[in-house]
Amino acid sequence: MMRCCRRRCCCRQPPHALRPLLLLPLVLLPPLAAAAAGPNRCDTIYQGFAECLIRLGDSMGRGGELETICRSWNDFHACASQVLSGCPEEAAAVWESLQQEARQAPRPNNLHTLCGAPVHVRERGTGSETNQETLRATAPALPMAPAPPLLAAALALAYLLRPLA
């Protein structure tokens, strides 16, 4: 039979081996509270990005002029940047995976190249009348630098979604 000490305070304390287990709820409580607080902005990153892509596709289907296409591309860029702005770690992971896809299937004529610089229309004709052949859209040559991650990722995602259309 086990005898207790005279002060009886040690009888109420847990054994030394169990003391660290008593701290476990204090360690687990903050992550559980954060999870129970509800979804954060990063939980909807894919949904938001998909909505930006759908808007891009809808606006590209409305007109085929370069100015309209580039305006749609710029709107997509702004939309995607806004969706991803609050989630830098998640956005970095998404962009990295999409960049890997883009590297595997590069496209020479892409929206980044077409819309990366302002379009200038230069008139070649000498008379007051011109036709379509005398107007040419030109853009300054882009430096040979890697495309920004957002643009490369968007191109990769558009390439991946191409068979669905």
From Swiss-Prot:
Keywords: Cell membrane, Glycoprotein, GPI-anchor, Lipoprotein, Membrane, Signal. A lipid is attached at A139 (GPI-anchor amidated alanine). GO terms for molecular function: identical protein binding. GO terms for biological process: neuron projection extension. It is found in: Cell membrane. The keyword Disulfide bond does not apply. One of its GO terms (cellular component) is axon. Residues 140-165 form a propeptide. It is a lipid-anchor; GPI-anchor. Residues 1-35 form the signal peptide. Belongs to the neuritin family. This is Neuritin-like protein. The gene is NRN1L.
